[in-house]
């Protein structure tokens, strides 16, 4: 049964969807844990952290498995008995550090205790807190010998505060059973057949096949966004193009990974290229950067089965 709903990043989520999603989907739902940084009770966060740390050191039968966690130069590892390392930590050491962290990074606003979102540890603390409830929910069902319901969560994912659930149209009915009452969960599904999650737009076709393409919240705004430099600005031209090569390649990689159809990929590439041309970038320089992108990452666009020359023509056809 699938009880780890947390992808490492949006790329991990996309790869999981593309490799393991069901051949036919009958529902697609998304939810948002709104303002959850400001609503996580510190007492519950400490309790859940203590339990998770304890489980890391124990076997399933309740016997101790490890004595220390050792921080090495290039890796961390558990040891069962003794270590002469000066950077070894017992279970109590780790929890005491976590407790100190929780007690000293909070902020007060309007009488509420908040976890500051800008700290490095905030997403990790929130992730482990929510994971503990998700795992407890699935384990609780299995202990009751229920198999059908937990199986319906096999295609459920949560990236920080965004939840995606495939083939489980009744996920919303279980929300109150999974998460603590302090959290506010909103259904953010666009339609019965489409929705957006993280930086992906997902859509079901008439045969239940799941398609993906790149999604950017800024596209929904009714005013233009300036997110790349203008060549006419007071900066040296050579560094500007150097930055562009990096930006262009990285963006095209993201588009090729996210866009299941060639047309969606071209639309995104054309939008980016047009934007940069309008900001003073030279056409010949952009084409050169595109060739570099294809040369290094051709495997990502080979699946479209379109020759590079045709892709270049399609992306630059308005120039």
Segments and roles (model prediction):
Residues 1-6:
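Glycine/proline-rich, flexible active-site/cofactor-binding loop segments
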Residues 9-28:
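A short acidic-Thr-Gly-centered motif at the start of a beta-strand
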Residues 12-17, 143, 149-152, 182-189, ...:
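Eukaryotic intrinsically disordered and solvent-exposed regulatory patches
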Residues 22-174, 192-197, 205:
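Conserved polymerase palm-domain catalytic core
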Residues 55, 113-127, 131, 135, ...:
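Active-site and adjacent loop segments of nucleotide-processing enzymes
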């Amino acid at each position: 049964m699938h009880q780890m709903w947390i992808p490492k990043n949006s790329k991990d989520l996309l790869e999981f969807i593309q490799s393991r999603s069901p051949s036919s989907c009958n529902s697609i739902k998304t939810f948002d844990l709104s303002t959850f940084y400001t609503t996580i009770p510190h007492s519950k966060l400490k309790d859940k952290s203590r339990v998770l740390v304890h489980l890391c050191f124990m076997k399933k039968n309740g016997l101790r498995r490890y004595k220390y966690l050792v921080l090495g130069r290039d890796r961390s590892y558990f040891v069962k008995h003794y270590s002469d390392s000066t950077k070894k930590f017992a279970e109590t050491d780790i929890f005491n550090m976590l407790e100190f962290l929780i007690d000293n990074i909070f902020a007060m606003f309007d009488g509420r205790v908040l976890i500051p979102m800008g700290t490095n540890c905030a997403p990790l603390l929130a992730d482990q807190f929510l994971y503990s409830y998700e795992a407890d929910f699935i384990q609780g069902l299995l202990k009751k010998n229920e198999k059908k319901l937990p199986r319906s969560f096999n295609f459920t994912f949560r990236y920080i505060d965004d939840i995606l659930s495939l083939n489980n149209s009744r996920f919303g009915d279980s929300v109150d059973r999974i998460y603590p009452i302090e959290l506010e969960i909103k259904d953010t599904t666009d339609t019965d057949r489409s929705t957006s999650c993280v930086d992906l737009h997902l859509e079901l076709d008439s045969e239940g096949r799941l398609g993906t393409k790149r999604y950017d919240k800024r596209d929904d705004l009714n005013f233009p966004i300036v997110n790349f430099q203008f060549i006419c600005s007071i900066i040296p031209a050579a560094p500007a193009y150097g930055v562009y090569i990096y930006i262009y390649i990285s963006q095209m990689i993201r588009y090729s990974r996210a866009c299941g159809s060639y047309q969606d990929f071209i639309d995104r590439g054309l939008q980016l290229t047009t934007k940069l041309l309008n900001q003073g970038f030279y056409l010949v320089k952009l084409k050169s950067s595109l060739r570099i992108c294809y040369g290094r990452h051709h495997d990502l666009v080979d699946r479209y089965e379109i020759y590079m020359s045709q892709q270049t023509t399609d992306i630059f056809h308005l120039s």
